[in-house]
């Protein structure tokens, strides 16, 4: 049985992320989305909210589950008996960074990373950009899963 992890902060999860999850789920028997804890970052959504939003947005993927993760991703992979890391790539800049990470993960733990090129319609989408546009009053409904868009609107309305 093959299993892979899709790690990230997902603050919030976007349709670009969902696209990568769907494509990974088609290639691996089991996919775990690891919502990584970063004590140096404060996000718009709490860690628990991010996990819940991904769960709500991926109910159509029976071989995918969402977990909290922290520390080295290779330790997460090994502890769960998974075999690979999956990362989405939007640009050459993403590739340069992710290639270094992939090589380090292979060096320290022998874990391979599989890269999935983002579908062109999502190639410009990032969590940061979606939050920025929404904060300035723009419509991001075509960039985010419906539950995420609704929760983002509610958070922004509560700030006003």
From Swiss-Prot:
<dbReference type="GO" id="GO:0015937">
    <property type="term" value="P:coenzyme A biosynthetic process"/>
</dbReference>
<dbReference type="InterPro" id="IPR014729">
    <property type="entry name" value="Rossmann-like_a/b/a_fold"/>
</dbReference>
<comment type="function">
    <text>Reversibly transfers an adenylyl group from ATP to 4'-phosphopantetheine, yielding dephospho-CoA (dPCoA) and pyrophosphate.</text>
</comment>
<feature type="binding site">
    <location>
        <begin position="9"/>
        <end position="10"/>
    </location>
    <ligand>
        <name>ATP</name>
    </ligand>
</feature>
<dbReference type="GO" id="GO:0005737">
    <property type="term" value="C:cytoplasm"/>
</dbReference>
<keyword id="KW-0460">Magnesium</keyword>
<feature type="binding site">
    <location>
        <position position="87"/>
    </location>
    <ligand>
        <name>substrate</name>
    </ligand>
</feature>
<dbReference type="InterPro" id="IPR001980">
    <property type="entry name" value="PPAT"/>
</dbReference>
<feature type="site" description="Transition state stabilizer">
    <location>
        <position position="17"/>
    </location>
</feature>
<comment type="similarity">
    <text>Belongs to the bacterial CoaD family.</text>
</comment>
<feature type="binding site">
    <location>
        <position position="9"/>
    </location>
    <ligand>
        <name>substrate</name>
    </ligand>
</feature>
<keyword id="KW-0808">Transferase</keyword>
<feature type="binding site">
    <location>
        <begin position="122"/>
        <end position="128"/>
    </location>
    <ligand>
        <name>ATP</name>
    </ligand>
</feature>
<feature type="binding site">
    <location>
        <position position="41"/>
    </location>
    <ligand>
        <name>substrate</name>
    </ligand>
</feature>
<feature type="binding site">
    <location>
        <position position="17"/>
    </location>
    <ligand>
        <name>ATP</name>
    </ligand>
</feature>
<feature type="binding site">
    <location>
        <position position="73"/>
    </location>
    <ligand>
        <name>substrate</name>
    </ligand>
</feature>
<comment type="subunit">
    <text>Homohexamer.</text>
</comment>
<protein>
    <recommendedName>
        <fullName>Phosphopantetheine adenylyltransferase</fullName>
        <ecNumber>2.7.7.3</ecNumber>
    </recommendedName>
</protein>
<feature type="binding site">
    <location>
        <position position="98"/>
    </location>
    <ligand>
        <name>ATP</name>
    </ligand>
</feature>
<dbReference type="GO" id="GO:0005524">
    <property type="term" value="F:ATP binding"/>
</dbReference>
<feature type="binding site">
    <location>
        <begin position="88"/>
        <end position="90"/>
    </location>
    <ligand>
        <name>ATP</name>
    </ligand>
</feature>
<comment type="pathway">
    <text>Cofactor biosynthesis; coenzyme A biosynthesis; CoA from (R)-pantothenate: step 4/5.</text>
</comment>
<keyword id="KW-0067">ATP-binding</keyword>
<dbReference type="Pfam" id="PF01467">
    <property type="entry name" value="CTP_transf_like"/>
</dbReference>
<keyword id="KW-0963">Cytoplasm</keyword>
<keyword id="KW-0547">Nucleotide-binding</keyword>
<dbReference type="InterPro" id="IPR004821">
    <property type="entry name" value="Cyt_trans-like"/>
</dbReference>
<keyword id="KW-0548">Nucleotidyltransferase</keyword>
<dbReference type="GO" id="GO:0004595">
    <property type="term" value="F:pantetheine-phosphate adenylyltransferase activity"/>
</dbReference>
<keyword id="KW-0173">Coenzyme A biosynthesis</keyword>
